[in-house]
């Protein structure tokens, strides 16, 4: 039996997510420490450049559906991978802090073309019956991007230097994505004479981007507003906690054990996303997301109230189970609630809103930590935001 071509697209999207999240999301956080340590630049300045990287990317993501329609998904992905690699090289080659903001323009554009909106656009046309499984598998690359490339980058830069390490890893990664894009993203369902796996033909799939709901109208729709608000609050809380997790745990566990806790959380994110992808079926995506957030809140409570290693591990496990699902549940909810012609635009716009929002999360929690001389209140805020996110999502369900 011939393997359905869509699964090759899924694994290509997985590879794009590994590369995109590694150099677009995780490694900038590592550079915050490395550039501060090596160059003596202020944490505030480097953090501002990272926020600029995220905000610029968010602005581009808003128009990703039109960009893909105009230039082709495979071309945009290939060019984005090259830009992300060049941007990363610009970050580590900077000799003055202002140059980070120039590098962020390039890296932000590359991250926009290799992040969640792009992964969704790759997978969406190929699946219907197994869409949840396909999207979950593809988005697992986002977690792997933090598990493998980041430790490798940190080790390699210590062995051969910051610039050579970036040149090797980013160069190899970009070359791989360019090749995979040409091989597996260039063909389309129409060019191969195929239909979405497990689904009948649907004329709506062929409609143009111009026929979709205007953004101004989307911003007035309850289903969109509650979906965007819920995931923006949830991801603000999640990114904020993850960015501070080592600093939170190191005083009681030590750096090595804190690192293992982060790894455990990431592994649980992969497990949680994979299991949900195979089992979610036709369940209400908003209810599942709210339950996902409730489990994470229990984990946050444990992290806020204990210093016992075993209980901290339980807290990281519970929080980690939901980490990956937040990224993949949003596209699945959009697929369930919007017409096929609108999904790409809806997903891109929500991802842009999410990214613009969570770009301020690390700094906001840092400010709260400094103001309260500890992590108790930052964790209270994280838990409260997750509960508000769940309520926002459920309120949208009632209004449908």
Indicate residue ranges for each PLM-predicted region.
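Extracytoplasmic
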Residues: 8-43, 64, 150, 241-246
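Extracytoplasmic gate region of multi-pass secondary transporters
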Residues: 28-32, 219-271
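Interfacial helix-cap and linker-helix signal at transmembrane-aqueous boundaries
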Residues: 35-36, 67-68, 148, 152-160, ...
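Conserved MFS/SLC helix-loop-helix module at the cytosolic interface between two early adjacent transmembrane helices
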Residues: 59-97
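Helix-to-loop junctions at the C-terminal end of transmembrane segments
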Residues: 60-72, 273-284, 369
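Intracellular juxtamembrane helix-capping segments at the cytosolic ends
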Residues: 113-127, 325-338
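Helix-loop-helix hairpin linking two adjacent transmembrane segments in secondary transporters
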Residues: 142-189
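C-terminal transmembrane helical hairpin of 12-TM major facilitator-type secondary transporters
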Residues: 265-269, 275, 282-333
């Amino acid at each position: 039996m011939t393997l359905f071509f869509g699964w090759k697209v899924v694994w290509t999207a997985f590879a794009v997510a590994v590369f995109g999240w590694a150099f677009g999301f995780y490694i900038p956080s590592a550079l915050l420490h490395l550039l501060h340590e090596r160059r003596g630049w202020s944490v505030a300045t480097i953090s501002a450049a990272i926020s600029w990287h995220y905000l610029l990317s968010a602005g581009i993501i808003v128009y990703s559906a039109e960009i893909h329609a105009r230039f082709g998904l495979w071309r945009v992905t290939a060019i984005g991978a090259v830009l992300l690699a060049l941007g990363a090289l610009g970050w580590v080659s900077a000799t003055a802090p202002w140059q980070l903001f120039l590098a962020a323009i390039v890296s932000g554009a590359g991250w926009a073309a290799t992040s969640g909106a792009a992964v969704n656009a790759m997978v969406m046309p190929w699946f219907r019956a197994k869409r949840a499984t396909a999207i979950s598998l593809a988005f697992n690359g986002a977690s792997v991007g933090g598990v493998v490339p980041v430790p490798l980058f940190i080790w390699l830069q210590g062995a051969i230097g910051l610039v050579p390490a970036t040149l090797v890893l980013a160069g190899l990664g970009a070359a791989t994505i360019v090749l995979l894009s040409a091989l597996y993203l260039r063909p389309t369902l129409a060019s191969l004479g195929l239909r979405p796996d497990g689904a009948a033909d649907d004329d709506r799939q062929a409609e143009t981007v111009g026929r979709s709901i205007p953004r101004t109208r989307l911003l007035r729709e309850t289903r969109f507003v509650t979906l965007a608000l819920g995931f923006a609050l949830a991801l603000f809380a999640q990114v904020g906690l993850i960015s501070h997790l080592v600093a939170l745990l190191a005083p009681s566990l030590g750096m090595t054990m804190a690192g293992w806790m982060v790894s455990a959380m990431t592994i649980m994110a992969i497990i949680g996303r994979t299991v949900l992808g195979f089992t979610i079926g036709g369940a209400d995506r908003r209810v599942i997301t709210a339950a996902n957030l409730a489990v994470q809140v229990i984990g946050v409570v444990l992290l806020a109230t204990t210093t016992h290693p075993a209980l901290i591990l339980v807290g990281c496990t519970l929080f980690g189970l939901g980490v990956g699902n937040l990224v993949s549940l949003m596209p699945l909810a959009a697929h369930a609630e919007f017409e096929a012609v609108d999904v790409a635009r809806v997903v891109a716009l929500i991802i842009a809103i999410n990214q613009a929002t969570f770009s301020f999360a690390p700094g906001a929690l840092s400010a709260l930590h400094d103001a309260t001389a500890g992590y108790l209140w930052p964790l209270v805020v994280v838990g409260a935001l997750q509960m508000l996110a769940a309520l926002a999502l459920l309120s949208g369900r009632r209004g449908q």
